[in-house]
Design a protein with these regions (language model features):
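A generic "binding-loop/recognition-motif" signal
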Residues: 44, 52-53, 71, 87-88, ...
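Short beta-strand His + acidic residue motifs that chelate non-heme Fe in jelly-roll/DSBH
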Residues: 48, 66-67, 83, 89-95
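A short hydrophobic beta-strand segment most commonly corresponding to one strand
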Residues: 38, 82, 97-112
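Short histidine-centered beta-strand/loop micro-motifs
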Residues: 24-25, 46-51, 92-94, 113-114
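A short, N-terminal "cap"/entry segment at the start of jelly-roll beta-barrel domains
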Residues: 1-32, 112-116
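Short acidic-glycine-tyrosine-enriched beta hairpin
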Residues: 70-85
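Glycine- and acidic-residue-biased ligand/ion/polar-headgroup-sensing regions
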Residues: 54-64
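Conserved short histidine dyad/triad with adjacent acidic residue
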Residues: 36-51, 85
Length: 116
């Protein structure tokens, strides 16, 4: 049973102030799962994008403005967003504190297309 440590995972900058760690994916032995830990500094964003698969986003810390399709809402720690395949979504951290999101995909290779 593999035990994976975030300290061993390289940080990927998604956009200024937004970092992602690929905790689980095909490179780490997963066959049909990807899990990413995303950190957003105050004012940072995850640009609007789509995926060919669904995505569950668990808000771990902080408060974010979330876009899902044509809707914009405020989400906080403990809430989960489910984005269906092909539906545009993204986040902006409009708070004065940092925020974290756990992004979960039903595929070993997460694919993302920026849309706006």
């Amino acid at each position: 049973m593999p035990i994976l440590d975030k300290a061993d995972v390289p940080r990927e900058e998604l956009s200024p102030g937004t970092d992602r760690w690929a905790l689980v994916d095909g490179d780490k032995g997963a066959e049909s799962l990807s899990v990413g830990d995303v950190s957003l500094a105050p004012g940072a964003k995850v640009p609007i994008h789509i995926h060919p698969t669904e995505e569950a986003m668990v808000i771990l810390e902080g408060e974010l403005e979330a876009v899902l399709g044509d809707e914009t809402v405020t989400v906080t720690a403990g809430q989960t967003i489910l984005a269906p395949p092909g539906v545009r979504h993204g986040f902006v951290n409009r708070s004065s504190g940092s925020a974290r999101v756990m992004a979960i995909f039903p595929t070993a290779r997460m694919e993302r297309t920026l849309v706006d």
